[in-house]
Design a protein with these regions (language model features):
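Paired acidic/hydrophobic, glycine-rich loop segments that form the ligand-binding mouth/hinge
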Residues: 85, 183-184
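Conserved N-terminal beta1-alpha1 strand-loop-helix module at the mouth
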Residues: 1-92, 99-127, 142-145, 152, ...
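A short, flexible beta-alpha/helix-coil linker loop
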Residues: 43, 133-136
């Protein structure tokens, strides 16, 4: 059975945080505090290292019952029995990834505009990662779509989606107000002085947003 996903606080890793094993303490702190979904993204690691790190991240996610998504690599997602995979526009087509991982896999697709969102929906994606919402040091070669871009995507598709790119405690609410189901966050969590406090603040804002919608 496909897992029910809460996209509200979607933690995404980055290569820069894998310089030493302290990353696993950071991830555990975030999971304890209430991260709802975790994506293992590590663009520069070799396949064997990707696999070994993914196993460690998967063990943490299992401990706190948080689904794990693997960035780009359907083979790694299959190998570690992750909940699914997140695909960029230049990665495997979603239909092929689903064939590899099965009908219960959670397939996410990056979308920068309404056309890409509709294409992903037609290709059986389960959710979208939309951005960059704001300028970000994590991905310097990406275009900024702003909250206006999120609103256009929200109007075009019924798929759940998260905003990604430059999202912080200060602008998280604006992302939700633009129609997003949550936000994919890297530096604002993993680079925080107090990871637990940061995640708890995000969690409170997400709960407030849900109560307003109800």
């Amino acid at each position: 059975m496909k897992p029910v996903i809460d996209y509200s606080i979607y933690l995404v890793t980055d290569t820069v945080y894998f310089k030493d094993d302290s990353i696993y303490n950071k991830l555990e702190a975030a999971l304890i505090a209430g991260v709802t979904l975790l994506q293992y993204r590590d663009k520069s690691a070799e396949t064997r290292i990707l696999y070994e790190r993914a196993l460690k991240v998967k063990a943490l996610c299992d401990k706190y019952r948080v689904p794990l998504i693997i960035n780009d690599r359907a083979d790694i997602a299959f190998a570690v029995k992750a909940a699914g995979v997140h695909l960029g526009q230049g990665d495997l087509p979603p239909l092929i990834a689903r064939r590899m991982l099965g009908s219960d896999a959670v397939i996410g697709v990056s979308a920068h505009n309404a056309d890409e969102a509709l294409k992903a929906e037609a290709d059986t994606a389960d959710y979208l990662g939309c951005g960059a919402v704001y300028a970000t040091a994590t991905k310097k070669d990406t275009s900024v779509i702003g909250t206006e871009g999120l609103s256009k995507i929200s109007a075009a598709t019924k798929l759940p989606f998260v905003g990604i790119g430059g999202i912080t405690l200060e602008n998280y609410k604006a992302v939700l107000q633009a129609g997003a189901n949550g936000a994919a966050i890297v530096s604002a969590i993993l680079g925080a002085d107090d990871i637990c406090q940061t995640v708890r603040k995000l969690k409170n804002m997400a709960l407030e947003a849900k109560s307003v919608k109800i």
